[in-house]
């Protein structure tokens, strides 16, 4: 069974699945779209490094093995149709909704849930919505929230070793065959905001037409390789 999304192809084979990263990059609920040769392999390896780091922190992810150049062997999950966002600083849609300055600290990590629905522009929902709509139980939502904060603080610590700031990050979770909440999808410049002394190292370069996003994505991969080898 195969499934193709905007940036990945999923192939389920027996007890495992293969997650193949495409070279596509999108923004604005898919309205902006380009193909950047090499992006898929960069995001796949970045994800593999960061998920391996998380597993060393006793955090469950779907990663089994990185198959160069652009494929991850993963545990199949029954995915929640959600994006779980953790914000450490004000940025993006948070500033548009609530005001404030980009890069302003939040007093505590803020967790937000969004239903994956491009036509409705990924509506933000609360835990009660998730239960009423049959998307997740309150217990599952709390597990996702708890895991998302733990993962974010671990990644914040990882990047701080090189004086990079993690501003916010988006996750997708699913259930394994035993009903455990497990981190799926990817961790890459497609899914987080990463800054260094005001310089942007994430998809905002593409969203805002600030230059070559592939160059920044490569620099993030090199950073992850370097930090991983320390």
Curated annotation (Swiss-Prot):
GO BP, sorted A to Z: 'de novo' IMP biosynthetic process; cobalamin biosynthetic process
Keyword vocabulary terms for this entry: ATP-binding, Ligase, Nucleotide-binding, Purine biosynthesis
Family matches, as PROSITE patterns: SAICAR_SYNTHETASE_1 (PS01057)
Domain of life per record: Bacteria
EC number, UniProt record: 6.3.2.6
GO molecular function term, any single one: phosphoribosylaminoimidazolesuccinocarboxamide synthase activity
Biological or metabolic pathway of the protein: Purine metabolism; IMP biosynthesis via de novo pathway; 5-amino-1-(5-phospho-D-ribosyl)imidazole-4-carboxamide from 5-amino-1-(5-phospho-D-ribosyl)imidazole-4-carboxylate: step 1/2
Annotated Pfam families: SAICAR_synt
InterPro entries to which the protein is assigned, alphabetical: SAICAR_synt/ADE2_N, SAICAR_synt_PurC, SAICAR_synthetase, SAICAR_synthetase_CS
Catalytic function, reaction form: 5-amino-1-(5-phospho-D-ribosyl)imidazole-4-carboxylate + L-aspartate + ATP = (2S)-2-[5-amino-1-(5-phospho-beta-D-ribosyl)imidazole-4-carboxamido]succinate + ADP + phosphate + 2 H(+)
Keyword Signal: no
Entry-linked HAMAP family: SAICAR_synth
Sequence similarity: Belongs to the SAICAR synthetase family.
Protein name: Phosphoribosylaminoimidazole-succinocarboxamide synthase
